[in-house]
């Protein structure tokens, strides 16, 4: 029998039958519907545990279009199976996934031909301190978290979204490692674009049962 992770966490970890965010979502349902219903949505890094959870939380508010980009081809396939097989889950008719990086030329082509999206959420990043294991890993970390992120922000400026969300980390607060510093730089860059489009970012701590975490 396959483990239902949601039920396992509720029964053995949080001991809550209902999400602690359920009341907030319900109290703001009208606002969320107004912001999301009928809007086009782009999710980068949507095959990961946090990105896919975001998608499942947003879909009940009925966006008109969902495009998901991730380098994990199997993860995208699993996401699609999960969405299609979940009873009562709304999936827009215009739902597409692409196995590529947001820094790839083909991504830029997709973005420009779509003329942008109403809502853009980016969950793609090097997120582990162990990404600093050698000089090549550090270069890749900075390239992804900062240099590619800057190019992406410039691309967003061509067709500004109504709302842009980007995930960060608690390690960006008074950073003591390169990964945290790279995310702090990313945060500062994002905030420099607030005059062009609405920006929100959130600092995550370690998320139990997420991909790559010790408890998973």
Role assignments for model-derived ranges:
Residues 1-40:
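Non-catalytic terminal and boundary segments that flank Rossmann-like NAD(P)-dependent oxidoreductase
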Residues 40-61:
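N-terminal Rossmann NAD(P)H-binding glycine-rich loop of SDR-like oxidoreductase domains
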Residues 57-68, 84, 90-91, 100-143:
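NAD(P)H-binding glycine-rich loop region in Rossmannoid oxidoreductase-like domains
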Residues 63-64, 159-163, 197:
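A short helix->loop->beta-strand "cap" motif at the edges of active sites that frequently abuts
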Residues 72, 82, 170:
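Residues in the short beta-alpha loop(s) of Rossmann-like NAD(P)-binding domains
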Residues 74, 105, 172-182, 194-216:
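Flexible, glycine-rich beta-alpha linker
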Residues 95-97, 141, 164, 199-202:
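Hydrophobic/aromatic anchor residues within beta-strands of the central parallel beta-sheet
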Residues 122, 126-143, 147-187, 192, ...:
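Conserved Rossmann-fold NAD(P)-dependent oxidoreductase catalytic core, especially the SDR/UDP-sugar
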């Amino acid at each position: 029998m396959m483990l239902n992770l949601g039920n396992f966490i509720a029964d053995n970890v949080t001991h809550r039958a209902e999400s602690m965010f359920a009341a907030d979502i319900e109290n703001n349902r009208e606002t969320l519907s107004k912001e999301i219903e009928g809007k086009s949505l782009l999710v980068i890094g949507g095959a990961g545990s946090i990105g896919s959870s975001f998608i499942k939380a947003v879909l009940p508010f009925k966006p008109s279009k969902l495009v998901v980009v991730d380098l994990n081809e199997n993860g995208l396939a699993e996401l699609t199976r999960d969405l299609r097989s979940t009873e009562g889950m709304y999936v827009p008719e215009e739902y597409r996934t692409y196995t590529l990086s947001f820094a790839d030329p083909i991504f830029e082509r997709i973005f420009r031909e779509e003329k942008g999206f109403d809502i853009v959420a980016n969950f793609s990043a090097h997120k582990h301190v162990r990404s600093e294991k050698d000089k090549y890993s550090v270069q890749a970390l900075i390239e992804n978290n900062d240099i590619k992120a800057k190019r992406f922000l410039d691309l967003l400026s061509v067709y500004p979204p109504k709302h842009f969300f980007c995930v960060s980390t608690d390690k960006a607060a008074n950073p003591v490692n390169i990964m945290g510093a790279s995310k702090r730089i990313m945060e500062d860059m994002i905030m420099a674009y607030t005059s062009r489009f609405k920006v929100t970012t959130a600092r995550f701590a370690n998320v139990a049962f997420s991909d790559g975490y010790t408890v998973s």
